Amino acid sequence: MIGVLGGTFDPIHFGHLRPALEVFQSIGLTELRFVPLNVAVHRRQPRATGAQRAEMVRVAVQGQTGFRVDENELARPGGSYSYDTLASLREGLGAREPVCLLLGSDAFRHFLTWHRPDAILSLAHLVVMRRP
């Protein structure tokens, strides 16, 4: 099962990493992809460039087996939507590989305002995390 955690990661911090590690270990993910977004649609734009944020994530997760940076979102023009990210991932993986979208409880409170929330649920399971 593959986990996906998107965010600005400007910067990545303990509130991202600790819950992600707990989910990774507790539900037995084989891989956890950290996806830095390109253009924020639900918050202010990041100050660091996409390349800088991807590098911050890469440094933060190095040495943790199964954690990796997915930079596909950074190459996509326009607003960064979880639906588009998951649809692209699902296309590459096929229908059989289970996918989980990890999100903080703060983000989950607004999930129904996201772009195509119903379609997101057809592409991935939701795992809601409480940040430390």
Please place each PLM-identified region on the residue numbering:
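Nucleotidyltransferase catalytic core that binds NTPs
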Residues: 1-132
